[in-house]
A protein has these predicted regions:
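Cleavable N-terminal signal peptides
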Residues: 7-8, 18
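Subset-of-secretome marker
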Residues: 21-141
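Sec/Tat signal peptide C-region and signal peptidase I cleavage site
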Residues: 14-20
């Protein structure tokens, strides 16, 4: 579960700028702390990782439609200086729907954001709140 939440955080933080020119994020070694809160978890789950974000990873012009789920709709809701907001709507296997709204603010060497995801399937609804903070801590090895 933690790895899935980290993957969602990484997508939300770094891949989502593919929706537009994005916000400033400097390449290098990043420390990212993600906190996920879901009603079915006894307490919020927090995870900190270090990730090397290279020019290639951050170059959104190199990202193709193949990198995005073709079944999902992606919308850039706001891009204003160093802040962006976007949403994603995807069908869920078994006939459900997932909707997520994300915001992120970056000054190049730090980033913070939050998101809310709602998944509806077979009459059940699951909500997830997530926040993250990250900072560039140096060059990649």
């Amino acid at each position: 579960m933690k790895n899935k939440m980290f993957a969602i955080a990484m997508l939300a933080t770094f891949a989502a700028p593919a929706l537009a020119d994005g916000i400033p994020v400097e390449p290098g070694l990043w420390s990212i702390t993600t906190t996920v809160n879901m009603p079915m978890m006894p307490a919020p789950q927090t995870m900190t990782v270090e990730e090397c974000m290279t020019d290639e990873i951050l170059d959104m012009e190199d990202m193709s439609d193949d990198d995005l789920d073709p079944n999902c709709d992606y919308a850039l809701d706001q891009l204003d200086g160093n802040t962006m907001a976007w949403s994603i709507d995807c069908p869920v296997e078994g006939g459900g729907q997932m909707h997520a709204e994300w915001t992120a603010t970056s000054n190049g060497d730090s980033v913070e954001g939050e998101g809310k995801m709602t998944m509806s399937m077979q009459g059940q609804t699951m909500n997830m709140d997530m926040s993250w903070v990250g900072e560039r801590i140096g060059a990649c090895d």
